[in-house]
Amino acid sequence: VTGVQTCALPISTLLIAAALSLSAANAYAAGLPQSATLKYSGSYGIPATMTFTRSGNQYTIVSRIKVPMYSIRFESGGTISGNTLRPKYYKDVRGGKLYAEAKFSGNSITYGKAGSSETAKTGGTTLDLFTLAWQLAANDARLPSGLNITNGKKLYPVSGMTKVGSENYKIGGGTTTVNKYRVKRGDDTVTYSFAPAFNNIPAEINYTDDGKTYDLKLTSVTINGKAVKP
Protein backbone atom coordinates (compact mmCIF):
# COMPACT_ATOMS: atom_id res chain seq x y z
CA VAL A 1 0.00 0.00 0.00
CA THR A 2 2.82 2.33 0.93
CA GLY A 3 4.48 1.73 -2.43
CA VAL A 4 1.30 2.65 -4.30
CA GLN A 5 0.85 5.84 -2.31
CA THR A 6 4.48 6.83 -2.83
CA CYS A 7 4.14 6.34 -6.59
CA ALA A 8 0.80 8.16 -6.85
CA LEU A 9 2.06 11.40 -5.32
CA PRO A 10 4.76 12.18 -7.89
CA ILE A 11 2.45 11.23 -10.79
CA SER A 12 -0.25 13.63 -9.62
CA THR A 13 2.35 16.30 -9.00
CA LEU A 14 3.70 15.87 -12.52
CA LEU A 15 0.20 16.08 -14.00
CA ILE A 16 -0.48 19.32 -12.13
CA ALA A 17 2.88 20.76 -13.17
CA ALA A 18 2.23 19.81 -16.78
CA ALA A 19 -1.19 21.45 -16.69
CA LEU A 20 0.25 24.62 -15.20
CA SER A 21 3.04 24.71 -17.78
CA LEU A 22 0.55 24.28 -20.62
CA SER A 23 -1.65 27.00 -19.20
CA ALA A 24 1.31 29.38 -18.89
CA ALA A 25 2.41 28.63 -22.46
CA ASN A 26 -1.07 29.31 -23.82
CA ALA A 27 -1.30 32.55 -21.85
CA TYR A 28 2.06 33.69 -23.24
CA ALA A 29 1.10 32.81 -26.80
CA ALA A 30 -2.11 34.81 -26.60
CA GLY A 31 -0.72 37.79 -24.76
CA LEU A 32 1.72 40.65 -25.13
CA PRO A 33 5.49 40.25 -24.69
CA GLN A 34 7.48 42.00 -21.99
CA SER A 35 9.58 43.56 -24.72
CA ALA A 36 9.98 43.35 -28.46
CA THR A 37 12.18 45.05 -31.03
CA LEU A 38 11.00 44.80 -34.61
CA LYS A 39 13.15 46.06 -37.47
CA TYR A 40 11.56 46.90 -40.79
CA SER A 41 12.54 47.94 -44.28
CA GLY A 42 10.31 50.67 -45.62
CA SER A 43 9.65 52.07 -49.07
CA TYR A 44 12.90 52.58 -51.06
CA GLY A 45 14.77 50.65 -48.36
CA ILE A 46 14.13 53.25 -45.64
CA PRO A 47 14.92 51.64 -42.25
CA ALA A 48 12.38 51.62 -39.43
CA THR A 49 12.29 50.19 -35.92
CA MET A 50 9.37 49.59 -33.57
CA THR A 51 9.83 48.72 -29.91
CA PHE A 52 7.21 47.49 -27.48
CA THR A 53 7.98 47.53 -23.76
CA ARG A 54 5.87 46.88 -20.70
CA SER A 55 6.48 47.37 -17.00
CA GLY A 56 3.71 46.11 -14.75
CA ASN A 57 0.51 47.38 -16.32
CA GLN A 58 2.25 50.19 -18.23
CA TYR A 59 3.31 50.00 -21.88
CA THR A 60 5.23 52.13 -24.36
CA ILE A 61 5.42 51.76 -28.14
CA VAL A 62 8.09 53.72 -30.02
CA SER A 63 8.38 53.63 -33.82
CA ARG A 64 11.22 55.34 -35.67
CA ILE A 65 11.32 55.86 -39.42
CA LYS A 66 14.34 57.44 -41.09
CA VAL A 67 13.28 59.37 -44.16
CA PRO A 68 15.58 61.56 -46.29
CA MET A 69 16.73 64.71 -44.46
CA TYR A 70 15.11 63.89 -41.09
CA SER A 71 13.66 61.17 -38.86
CA ILE A 72 10.12 60.55 -37.62
CA ARG A 73 9.43 59.24 -34.14
CA PHE A 74 6.00 58.00 -33.09
CA GLU A 75 5.46 57.28 -29.40
CA SER A 76 2.40 56.08 -27.54
CA GLY A 77 1.91 54.85 -24.02
CA GLY A 78 -0.72 53.86 -21.54
CA THR A 79 -1.95 50.94 -19.48
CA ILE A 80 -2.68 47.26 -20.12
CA SER A 81 -5.82 45.56 -18.82
CA GLY A 82 -5.80 41.88 -19.75
CA ASN A 83 -4.98 41.98 -23.46
CA THR A 84 -6.45 45.46 -23.95
CA LEU A 85 -4.23 48.49 -24.52
CA ARG A 86 -5.61 51.74 -23.10
CA PRO A 87 -3.55 54.69 -24.41
CA LYS A 88 -2.90 57.86 -22.44
CA TYR A 89 -0.90 59.74 -25.07
CA TYR A 90 0.43 59.66 -28.62
CA LYS A 91 3.18 61.85 -30.10
CA ASP A 92 4.44 62.44 -33.63
CA VAL A 93 7.92 64.00 -33.50
CA ARG A 94 9.67 64.99 -36.74
CA GLY A 95 13.24 66.21 -36.93
CA GLY A 96 13.30 66.38 -33.13
CA LYS A 97 10.29 68.72 -32.94
CA LEU A 98 6.74 67.91 -31.88
CA TYR A 99 4.56 67.74 -34.99
CA ALA A 100 1.26 66.46 -33.56
CA GLU A 101 -0.04 64.75 -30.45
CA ALA A 102 -3.11 63.24 -28.85
CA LYS A 103 -4.04 62.92 -25.18
CA PHE A 104 -6.65 60.48 -23.95
CA SER A 105 -8.89 60.82 -20.90
CA GLY A 106 -11.84 58.46 -20.59
CA ASN A 107 -14.00 58.94 -23.67
CA SER A 108 -12.35 62.29 -24.49
CA ILE A 109 -9.41 62.85 -26.80
CA THR A 110 -7.53 66.12 -27.31
CA TYR A 111 -5.57 66.14 -30.55
CA GLY A 112 -4.00 68.38 -33.17
CA LYS A 113 -0.79 69.70 -34.67
CA ALA A 114 1.67 71.48 -32.39
CA GLY A 115 0.24 74.84 -31.36
CA SER A 116 -3.39 73.94 -32.02
CA SER A 117 -5.75 71.35 -30.59
CA GLU A 118 -9.36 70.33 -30.28
CA THR A 119 -11.23 67.97 -28.00
CA ALA A 120 -13.75 65.36 -29.06
CA LYS A 121 -15.93 62.81 -27.29
CA THR A 122 -15.82 59.26 -28.63
CA GLY A 123 -18.27 56.48 -27.93
CA GLY A 124 -15.74 53.69 -28.39
CA THR A 125 -12.01 53.02 -28.55
CA THR A 126 -9.46 55.39 -30.10
CA LEU A 127 -5.98 54.13 -31.01
CA ASP A 128 -3.08 55.18 -33.19
CA LEU A 129 -2.22 52.74 -35.95
CA PHE A 130 0.86 51.32 -34.16
CA THR A 131 -1.04 50.64 -30.93
CA LEU A 132 -3.80 49.09 -33.02
CA ALA A 133 -1.23 46.72 -34.53
CA TRP A 134 -0.38 45.34 -31.07
CA GLN A 135 -4.01 45.34 -29.97
CA LEU A 136 -4.92 43.17 -32.97
CA ALA A 137 -1.86 40.96 -32.43
CA ALA A 138 -2.85 40.21 -28.83
CA ASN A 139 -6.49 39.51 -29.65
CA ASP A 140 -6.36 37.25 -32.72
CA ALA A 141 -7.11 40.18 -35.06
CA ARG A 142 -10.41 41.07 -33.39
CA LEU A 143 -11.22 44.72 -34.02
CA PRO A 144 -12.30 46.78 -30.96
CA SER A 145 -15.90 47.98 -31.16
CA GLY A 146 -16.61 51.62 -32.04
CA LEU A 147 -13.01 52.12 -33.13
CA ASN A 148 -11.46 55.41 -34.24
CA ILE A 149 -7.87 55.84 -35.41
CA THR A 150 -5.87 58.99 -34.72
CA ASN A 151 -2.59 60.16 -36.21
CA GLY A 152 -2.44 63.04 -33.71
CA LYS A 153 -3.78 65.47 -36.30
CA LYS A 154 -7.21 64.00 -37.03
CA LEU A 155 -9.71 61.35 -36.01
CA TYR A 156 -10.75 58.69 -38.51
CA PRO A 157 -13.75 56.38 -37.98
CA VAL A 158 -13.08 52.72 -38.71
CA SER A 159 -15.87 51.08 -40.67
CA GLY A 160 -14.54 47.53 -40.62
CA MET A 161 -11.73 45.08 -41.22
CA THR A 162 -11.43 42.22 -43.70
CA LYS A 163 -8.98 39.35 -43.97
CA VAL A 164 -7.49 39.36 -47.44
CA GLY A 165 -5.56 36.10 -47.27
CA SER A 166 -2.37 34.42 -46.10
CA GLU A 167 1.05 34.22 -47.70
CA ASN A 168 4.61 33.09 -47.10
CA TYR A 169 6.88 35.84 -45.84
CA LYS A 170 10.68 36.00 -45.56
CA ILE A 171 12.03 37.14 -42.19
CA GLY A 172 15.62 36.89 -41.00
CA GLY A 173 16.67 34.41 -43.67
CA GLY A 174 13.69 32.09 -43.11
CA THR A 175 10.09 31.86 -44.24
CA THR A 176 6.91 31.97 -42.19
CA THR A 177 3.19 32.33 -42.87
CA VAL A 178 1.48 35.68 -42.29
CA ASN A 179 -2.20 36.59 -42.26
CA LYS A 180 -3.11 39.85 -43.98
CA TYR A 181 -5.93 42.24 -43.01
CA ARG A 182 -7.22 45.54 -44.33
CA VAL A 183 -8.71 48.11 -41.96
CA LYS A 184 -11.00 50.74 -43.46
CA ARG A 185 -9.83 54.07 -41.98
CA GLY A 186 -11.92 57.00 -43.14
CA ASP A 187 -11.48 57.20 -46.91
CA ASP A 188 -8.38 54.99 -47.08
CA THR A 189 -7.09 51.68 -45.73
CA VAL A 190 -4.36 50.45 -43.41
CA THR A 191 -2.98 46.99 -44.18
CA TYR A 192 -1.55 44.76 -41.45
CA SER A 193 0.10 41.35 -41.71
CA PHE A 194 0.58 39.20 -38.60
CA ALA A 195 2.90 36.22 -38.06
CA PRO A 196 1.14 33.50 -35.99
CA ALA A 197 4.41 31.64 -35.38
CA PHE A 198 5.81 34.76 -33.67
CA ASN A 199 2.90 35.51 -31.30
CA ASN A 200 1.12 37.42 -34.10
CA ILE A 201 3.67 40.23 -34.16
CA PRO A 202 3.08 42.84 -36.90
CA ALA A 203 5.04 41.60 -39.92
CA GLU A 204 3.91 44.39 -42.23
CA ILE A 205 2.20 47.76 -41.85
CA ASN A 206 1.12 49.74 -44.91
CA TYR A 207 -0.49 53.16 -44.53
CA THR A 208 -0.67 56.65 -46.02
CA ASP A 209 0.03 59.88 -44.12
CA ASP A 210 0.36 63.44 -45.49
CA GLY A 211 0.14 62.06 -49.02
CA LYS A 212 3.05 59.65 -48.50
CA THR A 213 2.66 55.88 -48.42
CA TYR A 214 4.73 53.88 -45.94
CA ASP A 215 5.12 50.13 -46.45
CA LEU A 216 7.02 48.68 -43.49
CA LYS A 217 8.14 45.06 -43.94
CA LEU A 218 9.65 43.11 -41.06
CA THR A 219 13.28 42.02 -41.43
CA SER A 220 14.27 40.91 -37.90
CA VAL A 221 12.63 40.15 -34.56
CA THR A 222 13.78 40.21 -30.94
CA ILE A 223 11.23 39.13 -28.31
CA ASN A 224 11.99 39.35 -24.60
CA GLY A 225 15.67 39.86 -25.37
CA LYS A 226 16.04 36.86 -27.70
CA ALA A 227 16.36 36.92 -31.47
CA VAL A 228 13.59 34.94 -33.15
CA LYS A 229 13.79 33.36 -36.59
CA PRO A 230 11.49 31.08 -38.62
Residue ranges of predicted features:
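Beta-strand/loop-rich accessory regions of lumenal/periplasmic or secreted enzymes
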Residues: L132-D140
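Acidic, serine/threonine-rich low-complexity disordered tracts
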Residues: A30-G106, A141-P230
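Acidic/charged, solvent-exposed loop-and-adjacent secondary-structure segments enriched in E/D, K/R, S/T
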Residues: T110-L132
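Cleavable N-terminal signal peptides
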Residues: I16-A17, A27
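Short, small-residue-biased leader/transition segments that mark boundaries at the very start
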Residues: T2-L9
